[in-house]
Amino acid sequence: MLTALLLAVIGLGDLARTHLRRRAALLAVPVLAAAAVTAALLVGAPPLGAAIVVVLAGAWLLTTTTVENARPPGGLRPAVALVAAVLVLTAVDRAAGVPTGPLAPTTVASTLPPIEQLALAVGAGLFLLESGNVIVRAALFRELPQAEPAPRPRWSERFARREPADARLPDLQGGRTIGPLERLLIAGLTLAGAIGLAGAVLAAKGIVRFPEISRDGGSGEKAEYFLVGSLVSWALALGCAGLVAIAGR
């Protein structure tokens, strides 16, 4: 349950600061986090664990940015720390056993999948939407040559849209929209056991992108952008699918 809560709070926070203005995002993020924590407590999440999750999610929001062409203030370090936190929380969730919260008995007794699996599927889906883009961009900024970084924004500015800073990330049309849809599709097909269809999606993406990449000339930046971004995006989708599958066992 704690893993699902962490992914959900981070996912909701990133969606809010991407699509809302600064003031609205500053109000929406704590409200959404409180709602997610309350729901988790009602189905049996330990209060101390929920408090730790809120701290971890806050650290993520303070060390990352959803601004498309702004250099991530924390680089890839927040993503690495998040992976470690997810592994630890997954182990804690597995050791905790069946949830015992006020809403757990009726939910567990239903014909639906286990509540832990349902919660993790929702949390992973929210995370893959915008937080996946955050990690992909952090990997691209690390791997591709960049201009001098812009001054580090104040923490409150990371919750809102800003004018893009000067950056040299190659532009592949529709990447910010296609990426989340692709991750959700791959994760869903993997969970459904349709590995062949998931592979077809990956192949189709390469075919569709080939004309745009081939016009890149001799620099090869778009090809590297496509390769690095795709591999990171696919790894996130498969990782989330694995977490959901494990939660059902």
Residue ranges and their predicted role:
Residues 23-32, 50-52, 71-84:
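Cytoplasmic-side transmembrane-helix entry/capping segments in multi-pass membrane proteins
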Residues 1-8, 44-56, 195-202:
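Structural signature of hydrophobic alpha-helical transmembrane segments
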Residues 21-28, 211-235:
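Interfacial loop-to-transmembrane junctions
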Residues 178-209:
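Alpha-helical transmembrane segments of helical membrane proteins, especially in multi-pass transport
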Residues 2-20:
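N-terminal signal-anchor/start-transfer transmembrane helix
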Residues 67-141:
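Long, highly hydrophobic alpha-helical transmembrane signal-anchor segments
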Residues 240-249:
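Juxtamembrane boundary at the C-terminal end of a transmembrane helix
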